[in-house]
Amino acid sequence: MVKISKDTPLAELTFRKYEKPNSLKDRELVRKLCLSLGLLQPGDSRDVVVDVFQVILEAEEPISSLEVEKRVKKNRENKGLEQLGVAGSNIRRQLLRLRSLFLVEKTGSLYRINEGASLKELFSDKIEKYYLDSIMARVREYIDRADKFFKR
């Protein structure tokens, strides 16, 4: 019997290019940032990650997941958005997604923007230099292997 291996990636990145963000602000700016970073799918109505990220960006001090949940619910209510995906378990899942991209860090039970750095620094140092470089190196290994295997 043939064994079928699982095609589970060790790491995955999705980037999207949109129009320049000149006039965007508040939630719409964070939404486009989430779309650009692959945290949100185009047309996805389950967009609580936008609110979670915005709450963390606006927080002046590290905050707990319970406080994130409370602020997300309040923000969605103020904007007339449905209270979909605001359960504590989903808020923690979204925080984990933000942590996996090195945008948010958890210290004890509190969350903040990673190292209190700017998003530009985090993108450059963590995503481009670390995450993207390691993915690109592995893709190059597959390309080299394919070139050797399928000689022309």
Language model segments and positions:
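Eukaryotic partner-binding/assembly regions in large regulatory complexes
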Residues: M1-K17, K126, Y130-S134
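Short, amphipathic alpha-helical interaction segments positioned at domain boundaries
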Residues: S118-K148
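A short, conserved structural fragment
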Residues: L96-L110
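Short acidic, hydrophobic short linear motifs in intrinsically disordered regions
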Residues: P62-E82
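Short alpha-helical segments that sit at the start of domains
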Residues: F15-S64
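Basic, amphipathic "hinge/linker" alpha-helix immediately C-terminal to the N-terminal HTH DNA-binding motif
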Residues: L110-K120
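Short amphipathic alpha-helical interaction segments
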Residues: L81-S100
